[in-house]
Amino acid sequence: ISWHLALLLGLDLNDKNRVTFNELTETGIKAGMSHPRSIDINLVNAQQARRILDRLVGYKLSPFLWRKIRKGLSAGRVQSVAVKMICDRENEIRAFVSQEYWSIDGKFSANGERKTFAAKLNTVDGEKPELKNKEQADEILKRLEGAEFVIDKVKKSVHRKSPAAPFTTSTLQQEASRRLSFQARRTMKTAQELYEGVEINDMGQTGLITYMRTDSLRISDEARAAAYDFIRKKYGDKYIPDTPKKYKTKGNAQDAHEAIRPTHPEVTPDMVKASGVTSDQYKLYKLIWERFIASQMSNCLMDTVSVDISANGCNFKATGYSVKFDGFTVLYEEAKDDEGEKKNVLPPIKSGDSIKVRNLEENQHFTQPPARYTEATLVKAFEETGIGRPSTYVPTITTIINRNYVERDGKQLKPTSLGEVTNQLMSEHFDKIVDVKF
């Protein structure tokens, strides 16, 4: 855009007539205006190359689809690969053959206590058991009838759990889908509103977040200092890490903008809510704000315990933990921990203590096919494979749904018959173009 404007206005491309803003705040705009630069012609050429590739693919292949299938269809450098990924996953699901397997779980008590804890069969005669049917599970239970269980080993350690990095476009869309059930389009629409600015009490029209189309994990020193100031006042010095948290941006990232973060860390979600913003704006701002503040906090420290229990060559393993210092988890956690592990509170125990088995049971399971993509997992796959850019994730998903190549089934994305026919045709005749690595 800046290159086109410079040409129309007759400006010298070598002059410093380009300004950039990472946030629409007074500070951000003044900083941009005071540090102009010349137009980066390499970025201009990169955009031109992408546009040419898009046209070479789209302009040539779309008419081919019109002739072979029907009018109105389209193909594209990114959208056709996205359809192929979804079709390939569907074929994996169809080809999947579920396998039966069994597990053996025990309830134990130590030192005469009535309270029990859980342990799972881990090895049999030093090998991982493969119990493929009930008969094999029954053999293990028979082998353990009347057996004397002993505690072989108790291992204690401290586990350090680090906070998640601040959001990129991809991770924001994924987490908003998981936590808020927002589709990617809804997330980006709301993020755009927060970036452009909303009315905040005593602040007027204020841009609340930095630019929301980014693949960078970098944050400014000023933002980190503001986060520390809030953390210190709210939680105390022990919640500030000894060394600043710095997150490594992926190698294929452009790193043109900071990570997505609040422009004013001191503006809490409650303050934003009190200003009368929409429900979506409040929810998304709260998610972005909590994630950013937590990313700059101390690690969570957990005391972990692992207990090995054996009888007749069968080894059971119990694991559990307790929180020693909550750290960043006082504010935010990316995903729920294993609830079963949380509830498995182990008693004070050491090697050689008496142990009694209270119950042994066998449980049947079946292996599960790979899950269909959701918007969140598809965006994650885009990022991991380098397909598209943060600015194209939502348009790509919107296009393949609007073209009726893909449809929603709850949160899942599945190919339509039209999508599968189109993908098969593209894969047979233009396999390199629909290759993920193209």
Language-model features, listed with the residues they occupy:
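Toprim catalytic domain recognition across nucleic-acid enzymes
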Residues: 1-380, 392-396, 401-405, 410-413, ...
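Short, intrinsically disordered, charge-balanced linker/junction segments flanking boundaries
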Residues: 432-438
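Flexible beta-alpha connector loops of hexameric P-loop NTPases
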Residues: 179, 385-386
